[in-house]
Amino acid sequence: LRDEEQTAESIKNQMTVKEWEKVFEMSQDQNLYHNLCTSLFPTIHGNDEVKRGVLLMLFGGVPKTTGEGTSLRGDINVCIVGDPSTAKSQFLKHVDEFSPRAVYTSGKASSASGLTAAVVRDEESHEFVIEAGALMLADNGVCCIDEFDKMDMRDQVAIHEAMEQQTISITKAGVKATLNARTSILAAANPVSGHYDRSKSLKQNINLSAPIMSRFDLFFILVDECNEVTDYAIARRIVDLHSRIEESIDRVYSLDDIRRYLLFARQFKPKISKESEDFIVEQYKRLRQRDGSGITKSSWRITVRQLESMIRLSESMARMHCCDEVQPKHVKEAFRLLNKSIIRVETPDVNLDQEEEIQMETDEGPGGINGHADSPAPVNGFNGSGEDASQETVPKPSLRLAFAEYCRISNLIVLHLRKMEEEEDESALKRSELVNWYLKEIESEIDSEEELINKKRIIEKVVHRLTHYDHVLIELTQAGLKGSSEGSESYEEDPYLVVNPNYLLED
């Protein structure tokens, strides 16, 4: 796919008139991004973000050399993590078949020397010679590593240098050499427990070291969720492929067209405009602030490597559209992709009954059904009444709230309390006052008494969680006023709430 000595003009001269017209037509396509994704992976249903990430990896960023001679890589590394049967290996196979210079290997079956390089004795001269490994063979191409998490830790360490510095250094048996490994790495990994646990962070789900994780520009998480519409569409696609292989594959562009376009577009070396520079810095600041703040802990630590990833992805977007300059719209898409790969995992539904369920499990011991808060009603304090005894066998579903909705409510509460803080000296609100204020704010959404009770229950649980779990809100203690036991009891039941001064509001 790559030839450093060629220019866009020389590649154009190698094409026939018809081929060049097709390449030119593709460059003018308003829907090029989507059409390239669907044409490259016609047999894979959905997973659009992964397709976009892999496509940008094929175009790549612009490699640079600083004044001191330090090389900055332009290659984009992508890791796909997910449950079994979510088309991870299919992506790797597609890239391996499409790219002229791609090497496909399995992490479990590859040793450190098999991936980098080995020193062996030549049969004829009996001297030590270097035997190229997968990363060297994929120089100026793509190295697809399946079962990446199954690699031994010492074998993972061997590719640290290749992933960041794009070289492989060898000092074995009197042979000392530094070899090029300018390759993009497309890796696929399975979660530790077999299925992705959305309540844990990405780092806890996969068996990869922190240095390796930071060297990947994009992480994509594929979770096998039961969804009737998606399951039907996937089943239809697979059955169509088995029954009508040729007819079912619908491509806008042929693979040869894409190869020619890729070869032509890769000759562009887009420069970052001043406007885009400022935009990149602004977006990086947003990522860093979000990483250091409250509710969500991102998939991994946001470092300068993620800033470089954003630059490479922006350059790749500009290359794809055959632009000589990186524009803010390219940076925006790069930030969106990077943001998706960082944040997407951290959005499980929030279980607002978590504390009560833990309490029930403790009280019940081995008697309860695992995973269900199904004891009679000790939560409401009515345990033992005849009415509730008849409902003992019915499991009580836990109250869950979508993560985005939980963030929206918490941001609304924080903004209101901070506004009160700015306007008045006595900014603290009682918990009951805060609940009443929120219900008044959403009164247009409430149509019945039952809905009002439900919304009140939700906001009370959210406030409780923000106070005792996320520590976004602080209950003011009544220090030194222990004399009046009656007053202190009412104070404990309905305390004053203020926002934690160290809390940084989410975007």
Swiss-Prot record:
Residues the entry annotates as binding ATP: 45, 85-89, 190
Source domain of life: Eukaryota
GO term, biological process aspect, one: DNA replication
SMART domains for the chain: MCM
Domain called MCM: residue spans: 32-239
Record's miscellaneous remark: Early fractionation of eukaryotic MCM proteins yielded a variety of dimeric, trimeric and tetrameric complexes with unclear biological significance. Specifically a MCM467 subcomplex is shown to have in vitro helicase activity which is inhibited by the MCM2 subunit. The MCM2-7 hexamer is the proposed physiological active complex.
Protein name per its UniProtKB record: DNA replication licensing factor MCM6
Organism: Rattus norvegicus
